[in-house]
Regions:
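Conserved Nudix-box catalytic region and its N-terminal flanking loop in Nudix hydrolases
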Residues: 12-52, 56
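A short coil-to-beta-strand element that immediately follows conserved catalytic motifs
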Residues: 56-66
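Structural detector for helix-capping/boundary residues
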Residues: 7, 15, 33, 47, ...
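NUDIX/MutT-family hydrolases
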Residues: 87, 95-126
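Conserved hydrophobic "DFG−1" position in protein kinase catalytic cores
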Residues: 11-12, 19, 88, 105
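Short aromatic/basic micro-patch
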Residues: 29, 80, 105
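Conserved N-terminal beta-strand and adjoining loop/helix that marks the start
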Residues: 1-17
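Active-site-adjacent beta-strand/loop module that shapes the phosphate/pyrophosphate-binding cleft
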Residues: 68-94, 125
């Protein structure tokens, strides 16, 4: 079994979670991405969020939320994504980068347009009554 190691930023506003859709895709993903060689989770998170949304994560505000594993969306069976999720504040104005078609605040009504691992995260946030 192959695992794709990723980190994600859980940004909640008005009981909804920030999600992004890459250009050419129809599925939304929680912002974040794969680590580069030698990076810590926080370094990866800061870099990926700056690249995708042009904001600066406030490192001192970052808190671990949980790790979620599911079939990788769009990959062959047996390829799994392991997503380490963090909550944290930011500075700046959210702006979709050139690789991001749009960002959107999603609720439980949007469960059909998100990836497999994101569904597990959504269910956890719903159970904790963090999103609705």
């Amino acid at each position: 079994m192959k695992y794709i190691d990723k980190v994600a930023w859980l940004l909640i506003k008005d009981n909804k979670i920030l999600s992004t859709r890459s250009k050419g895709k129809d599925t939304f993903y929680i912002p974040g991405g794969k680590r580069e060689l030698g990076e810590t989770d926080i370094q990866t998170l800061v870099r990926e969020i700056k690249e995708e949304l042009d904001v600066d994560i406030i490192k001192e505000s970052v808190n671990y939320y949980g790790t979620f594993t599911a079939q990788s969306h769009g990959d062959i069976a047996g390829v799994k994504v392991q997503m380490k999720c963090y909550l944290g504040l930011y500075e700046g104005t959210l702006t979709a980068s050139s690789e991001i078609a749009e960002y959107r605040w999603l609720s439980s009504d949007d469960i059909e347009i998100i990836s497999h691992v994101d569904k597990l995260i959504f269910f956890s946030l719903l159970k904790s009554e963090i999103i609705f």
